[in-house]
């Protein structure tokens, strides 16, 4: 007599189906397709965790550049000026200053400009 898949098999399948809950169509019902969808979602999640960091850095740079240009300096010259002036501030904080505290940002820009002029 043939032995059928018992409780162990059912538990294993339900574990994968639970991870696929909310997926569209057969991806949340069929075991094989659900397992493939879950594994694929993990690869997307891994890739996009790395990509998110890149996207935010691009956003911060764009904001800094947009705020610095009316003050008469480009982004690259501003970063160079900050390095010469030995001002260690990251791009995220510079972006926050540019948006929420424009006067503080303009003071930092002026220090960067003066350090570039002395160079």
Curated annotation (Swiss-Prot):
Gene Ontology CC, one term: ribosome
Family matches, as SUPFAM superfamilies: Ribosomal protein L20
Record InterPro entries: Ribosomal_bL20 (IPR005813), RIBOSOMAL_L20_CS (IPR049946), Ribosomal_protein_bL20_C (IPR035566)
Record CDD domains: Ribosomal_L20
Source organism superkingdom: Bacteria
Keywords annotated in UniProt: Ribonucleoprotein, Ribosomal protein, RNA-binding, rRNA-binding
Listed PROSITE patterns: RIBOSOMAL_L20
Family from the record: Belongs to the bacterial ribosomal protein bL20 family.
Protein name: Large ribosomal subunit protein bL20
Gene transcribed to yield this protein: rplT
């Amino acid at each position: 007599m043939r032995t059928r898949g018992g409780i162990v098999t059912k538990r294993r399948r339900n574990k994968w189906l639970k991870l696929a809950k909310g997926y569209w169509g057969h991806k949340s019902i069929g075991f094989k397709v659900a397992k493939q969808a879950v594994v694929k979602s993990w690869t997307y999640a891994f890739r996009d965790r790395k990509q998110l960091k890149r996207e935010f850095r691009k956003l911060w740079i764009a904001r800094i550049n947009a705020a610095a240009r009316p003050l008469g300096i480009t982004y690259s010259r501003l970063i160079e000026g900050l390095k010469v002036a030995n001002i260690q501030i990251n791009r995220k904080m510079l972006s926050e200053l540019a948006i929420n505290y424009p006067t503080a940002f303009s003071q930092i820009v002026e220090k960067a400009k003066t350090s570039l002029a002395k160079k």
